[in-house]
Amino acid sequence: MPRRALAEKRPLLLASIAAALAFYYLRWGPWPELYLIPIKGAAVGLLALYLWQRHSSPDARLLAWAFGAASLGDMALEIETDRLIGGLLFFAYHVMAMGVYLRNRRPRLARSQKTAVVTMLLLTPAIAWFLPADRAEAANIGIYALALGAMAASAWASVFPR
């Protein structure tokens, strides 16, 4: 069987890579930022579409939805000034990704792995809460970091390779 090029075999994957590279190179050019927002969202959005088309398992579908939320969150963070909508979309991404990881838990965790899980879960929001200079934002950032820490902890406790 002949080896086909990535462009023939997985064009959405190649387009996703191209969009990611294009965004980071074009943002230093003379183009208005408004034109770059869809390119930024396309990098992860095309991964979501690729995943949806190539895999039909419930985990893959949930991960595709998660990538879709992350793509919209990326674009919302570029558009919005208060970052609420982007933050909520990324919060949703973390919760959906956590769902994939929790459905694929390791049957047993060693004591060191349990310690790592608890550390990620607790320290991520605690550190994030102390970081903002604007203390009015500390609670929102801490809540977001709780979802981030929970996702990282559930990924660590999953059967997926580290």
Residue ranges: model-predicted function:
Residues 1-162:
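Polytopic alpha-helical membrane-helix bundles and their juxtamembrane interface segments
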